[in-house]
C-alpha cells in the first residue's frame, strides 16, 4: 500500500497509511478542506499523514479534538470517499 486509503462507514472515517490506522468519529469532524499551505505548516499541532514531499495536494480534516493533514497526489478520490 503506497498511498493513503480512506474509508467511510456510517459512524467513522478510517484512514490507513503504511502500518498506521486512524479512526475519526464522524460526529467529531468539523470541516474538510483543501490545505493550500506548503507542507501543512500553518497548524503545527496537526497530525500529518503521508509523505509531505513528492505530493501535490493536501487535505485538512478539522475535528473537535485534533486536526489532520493528508498529503496525497490523489485528492479527488480521497475527497470523494470522505464526502460520500
From Swiss-Prot:
InterPro entries: PH_SunI-like (IPR055365). Pfam families: bPH_8. Belongs to the UPF0457 family. This is UPF0457 protein BT9727_2307.
